Amino acid sequence: MCIRDSDGSAPKLKETLKHLWSRESFRHLSIACGIHAFVSYGAGNFLPSLFLRLHDIETGELGTWLALSSVAGGVGTFMGGYLSDKLGKQDPRWYQWVPAITTLIYLPFTLFIYLTDQTYLALMTTFITGMLFNAYLAPNLAITHSLVGLRMRAMSSAILFFILNFIGLGFGPMVIGFVSDMINPTYGIESIRYSLLIVIPFSTVWSATHYFIAAKHIRDDLELAPK
């Protein structure tokens, strides 16, 4: 496939999107990333509310803890890329296996945060969940770039981030909030806890499933990538 137009310019959006969407691995990884962001933005927006409603902690102290835990997210992004590059030298499927595995490992830790009454233990656990759940981004960007030609890479990043943010920001906080409001008459201030418990586990496993499916097609799709 031609990776630039006849005048030397980069391929247009339509061409890049058509190329990406013809690759089954990208279709599944983009859905996985979108659901991943759905969990991230949904849980992230309501986690402060969970602590303020159900734990004895002041706003300022909570903000400090959560700000510090975001550093772990940066570490997770680096480690996700590092592990994928290291393991991917032997088998490119690791670029999807790393996000899938870290996403599944994340789940029991985040369930502990939602269920425990131990405030500071829950806050310390956010460092673990932050690191694990941010390990997905670098591998998915790397494999997306590998599926396209050099001149398509910027646009392919934009397409992936559009899907990620459309699903994540567009629906994550809205769905968590909607479920919380629906069950509020029954559970009161506990409704945010049960909303997270209803939505997050299913969505997390759903995301990981698409990563595993994408991994099945990675090697074949990389063979078709423009050189």
Give each language-model segment a name.
Residues 85-102:
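Cytoplasmic membrane-interface "Motif A"-like loop-to-helix N-cap segments
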Residues 120-136:
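Hydrophobic core of transmembrane alpha-helices in multi-pass small-molecule transporters
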Residues 51-52, 83-84, 88, 175-185:
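Interfacial helix-cap and linker-helix signal at transmembrane-aqueous boundaries
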Residues 107-115, 197-227:
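Multi-pass alpha-helical transporter architecture, strongest
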Residues 4-30, 54:
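Juxtamembrane intracellular "pre-TM" segments in multi-pass secondary transporters
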Residues 23-80, 133-141, 168-176:
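Extracytoplasmic gate region of multi-pass secondary transporters
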Residues 77, 147-185:
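A late C-terminal transmembrane helix in Major Facilitator Superfamily
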Residues 58, 94-97, 180-201:
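A membrane-interface helix-boundary motif in multi-pass transporters
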